[in-house]
Amino acid sequence: MVVKIKGKVFVFGDNVNTDEIIPARYLNTSDPQELAKYCMEDARPGFGRRDDIKGSIIVAGENFGCGSSREHAPVAIKAAGISCVIAKSFARIFFRNAINIGLPIVELKEADEFEEGDIAEVDLENGVVRNLTKGKEYRIRPYPEFLMKIMEAGGWLEYCLKEVGE
């Protein structure tokens, strides 16, 4: 079960919208690996093609994932190898889409205390976020058991298929 996530932090600001996460000009495919190449392209050109983003954590400000309701946005993030997104707040539809595809996301009002390159650790089950670089610890609402099961399965569809198969 995915309980603890640890990775290098990449910082983004407030109101990162779905067009910045995966620009519409790249939506001519639904292949996650193709989408991954253009992850965050309009917010930080070339980000999705960096070698050092696998296993990393995006930390952002308010209203992450605002804009259109395209599911491609969290798919691009997950396929790029981002292990978790921490933000002060999320657009509701992005939040739901991320959970549906098994991308862990965490709301943390102190997200702005992280800096680019910090090492973060997220404990979904116990509700703790740590900035290991700065030695700080923050409490968050732990993921309920059913969300942990969705994350473990890899997303909502996979969870449902597993439940039907049992």
Curated annotation (Swiss-Prot):
Keyword Lyase: yes
Gene3D superfamilies recorded: Aconitase, domain 4
PANTHER family recorded: 3-ISOPROPYLMALATE DEHYDRATASE SMALL SUBUNIT 1, 3-ISOPROPYLMALATE DEHYDRATASE SMALL SUBUNIT 2-RELATED-RELATED
Record has Lyase as a keyword: yes
Name assigned to this protein: 3-isopropylmalate dehydratase small subunit 2
Keywords annotated in UniProt: Amino-acid biosynthesis, Branched-chain amino acid biosynthesis, Leucine biosynthesis, Lyase
Classification lineage: Bacteria, Thermotogati, Thermotogota, Thermotogae, Thermotogales
Pathway: Amino-acid biosynthesis; L-leucine biosynthesis; L-leucine from 3-methyl-2-oxobutanoate: step 2/4
Natural source organism: Thermotoga maritima (strain ATCC 43589 / DSM 3109 / JCM 10099 / NBRC 100826 / MSB8)
